[in-house]
UniProtKB/Swiss-Prot annotation:
Transmembrane portions of the chain: none
Key word Ribonucleoprotein present: yes
Keywords: Ribonucleoprotein, Ribosomal protein, RNA-binding, rRNA-binding
Species assigned in the record: Wolbachia sp. subsp. Brugia malayi (strain TRS)
Gene: rplU
Subunit structure comment from the entry: Part of the 50S ribosomal subunit. Contacts protein L20.
Protein name (record): Large ribosomal subunit protein bL21
Lineage: Bacteria, Pseudomonadati, Pseudomonadota, Alphaproteobacteria, Rickettsiales
GO biological process, one term: translation
Family assignment from sequence similarity: Belongs to the bacterial ribosomal protein bL21 family.
Length: 100
């Protein structure tokens, strides 16, 4: 069984036992979170399923890879180099439920 969930403005295809990296969630490591925005469950449709939930365990709160931002204006000796690291949460999917 698989599900498509939405969190942090992005959609993820998940199965039981899969590990995903999502935008930062307010949860401590080792705690369980419940995601109720299931877009699709085993191909049942493309609308939000109000009775479907996905339970996941928070494995880690960390930061992603660094993204380099480089701005330049030619012939003007203008160069700016900055970087950014986004906070992410690593989840392990434990359970996919569909209450009927």
């Amino acid at each position: 069984m698989f599900a498509v969930i939405e969190t942090g403005g992005k959609q993820y295809l998940v199965k039981k036992g899969s590990v995903i990296k999502v935008e930062k969630l307010e949860a401590e490591e080792g705690k369980e979170v419940e995601i109720d925005k299931a877009v699709c469950l085993s191909g049942n449709g493309l609308s939000y399923l109000t009775d479907a939930t996905v339970k996941a365990e928070v494995l880690e709160q960390c930061r992603g890879e660094k993204i380099i931002i480089f701005k330049k204006k030619r012939r003007k000796n203008y160069r700016r180099k900055t970087g950014h690291r986004q906070y992410i949460t690593v989840l392990r999917i434990n359970e996919i439920n569909l209450q009927k």
